[in-house]
UniProtKB/Swiss-Prot annotation:
GO terms (BP aspect): photosystem II repair; proteolysis
GO CC, alphabetical: chloroplast; chloroplast thylakoid; chloroplast thylakoid lumen; plastid; thylakoid; thylakoid lumen
Protein's cellular compartments: Plastid, Chloroplast thylakoid lumen
Role description: Probable serine protease.
Keyword Transit peptide: yes
Family membership: Belongs to the peptidase S1C family.
Keywords for the protein's UniProt record, in alphabetical order: Chloroplast, Hydrolase, Plastid, Protease, Serine protease, Thylakoid, Transit peptide
Organism for this UniProt entry: Arabidopsis thaliana (Mouse-ear cress)
Protein name: Protease Do-like 8, chloroplastic
Domain PDZ: from-to ranges: 336-433
Length: 448
């Protein structure tokens, strides 16, 4: 229904009053309790100011029943569509809003928790001992003299001492090592973080590498003031559950810190070089590509391992990380620096592969196949496997223990002997037929 009233805003000028304007005034007066009986709606000529007589016009023109209907409609509209009419009231006048009215309260940062502060200190102290290593391949330039460096990958390393020795993984510079470089050849580029936050780049020259333990040593000609050697701790006393920190350059993001705990000890690490490394440290600290060669630290900031691998089915850090224990690093690195290789202790005899030993019903121990003549093993009295007069196989000695350390198979014997040095004397417990014997033998340098 639409109610229209003609009125004059000026003398002799007719205007029409819209429904919304009329409704607004009517509702205002009704809410004040004005009740007047009215004649039927009609067009009324307004001769006075419409602003002052609009209410009187509406009261006289609109019956009480109609007013109640209009009021009810307005009330229901406000209930079901409040945002249409009340948004301005809720939001206020934006023209008078200030920054202080809408800004949240800002609280000061405050001091760090003790655990946070300790981790921050450990990182700030050791981050300068961590370097970024880029493996490079030198290739001849076409139609030009000289060579060009082709970056192959990147990893991490640690400053070993103030003389410029850098320890990293074998596989970090594996592409360069596949060319069989000589000691002193450039096999990578090393970035060292200075105290002012600037990365200094140096040539990484090969000192020595050990594929069996996935370790390598480089040398950089950097000023001693730039070199911050890392402190090496003992890994023999580690406990599962203690906190550890890993620093490295995952995915090229230099000097990244991850925190976790030691989740396992004495693990066999299947390294990227394809060899098995015993005694590994297992951790849940995230170790990604680029972390290899970086340090694993204990809660005191001491090096307890060199990060080397991650077991994952996704190719990311959502898996289990492994580190070469510092006890192994302390044994290998000094030899690489002194001899450019590792002098491994061994017996220098030929042992039967485990599948062959199993076929010969040797279920426990390492079966001796051959013993070189005039060797220390022959002098100690070890017997090889041979054939009898009838062509039957006569089993040689079976090594079942080294200094009371049980030997289950050939791989176990190699792992045990790797703990000794050249010249050490050990006692071998062997089975010879139905006899149990003990033989003393001096370990010699393992032949390649």
């Amino acid at each position: 229904m639409q109610v229209i009233a003609s009125f004059c805003s000026k003398p002799n000028e007719n205007e029409f009053v819209g429904r919304r304007q009329l409704l607004s005034s009517v509702c205002s007066k009704i809410s004040q309790g004005d009740v007047v009986s009215h004649p039927p709606v009609s067009s009324v000529k307004v001769t006075q100011d419409w602003k002052s007589n609009l209410h009187e016009l509406a009261v006289k023109s609109v019956p009480s029943t109609t007013r109640r209907i209009l009021l009810t409609s307005l009330f229901m509209n406000l209930c079901f569509n409040p945002s249409r009419y009340l948004s301005a009231l809720a939001l206020g006048d934006p023209s008078v809003a200030t920054v202080e009215d809408v800004s949240p309260t800002v609280f000061p940062a405050g001091p760090l928790f003790p655990t946070e502060g300790r981790i921050v200190q450990l990182f700030e102290k050791n981050t300068y001992s961590v370097v970024n290593i880029f493996d490079v391949t030198l290739r001849p330039q076409l139609k030009m003299t000289g060579v060009v460096e082709i970056p192959e990958g990147n990893g991490s390393g640690v400053v070993w001492d103030g003389q410029g020795y850098i320890v990293t993984n074998y596989h970090v510079i594996g592409n360069a090592l596949s060319r069989n470089p000589s000691p002193g050849d450039v096999v990578g580029r090393v970035n060292i973080l200075a105290s002012d936050g600037v990365q200094k780049n140096f040539e990484g020259k090969l000192v020595g590498a050990d594929r069996a333990k996935d370790l390598a040593v480089l040398k950089v000609d950097a000023p001693e003031t730039l070199l911050k050697p890392i402190k090496v701790g003992q890994s023999n006393s580690l406990k599962v559950g203690q906190q550890c920190l890993a620093i490295g350059n995952p995915f090229g993001f230099d000097h990244t810190l991850t925190v976790g705990v030691i989740s396992g000890l004495n693990r066999d690490i299947f390294s990227q070089t394809g060899v098995t490394i015993g005694g590994g440290i297992q951790t849940d600290a995230a170790i990604n590509p680029g972390n290899s060669g970086g340090p694993l630290l204990d809660s005191k900031g001491n090096l307890i391992g060199i990060n080397t691998a991650i077991f994952t089915q996704t190719g990311t850090s959502a898996g289990v990380g492994f580190a070469i224990p510092s006890s192994t690093v302390l044994k290998i690195v000094p030899q690489l620096i002194q001899f450019s290789k590792v002098l491994r202790a061994g017996i220098n005899i030929e042992l039967a592969p485990d599948p062959v030993a199993n076929q010969l019903n040797v279920r426990n121990g390492a079966l001796v196949l051959q013993v070189p003549g005039k060797s220390l093993a022959e002098k100690a009295g070890l017997h090889p496997t041979s054939r009898g007069f009838a062509g039957n196989i006569v089993l040689g000695d079976i090594i079942v223990a080294v200094d009371d350390k049980p030997v289950k198979n050939k791989a176990e014997l190699m792992k045990i002997l790797d703990e000794y040095s050249v010249g050490d004397k050990v006692t071998l417990k062997i089975k010879r037929g139905n006899e149990d014997l003990e033989l003393k033998i001096s370990l010699e340098e393992k032949s390649s």
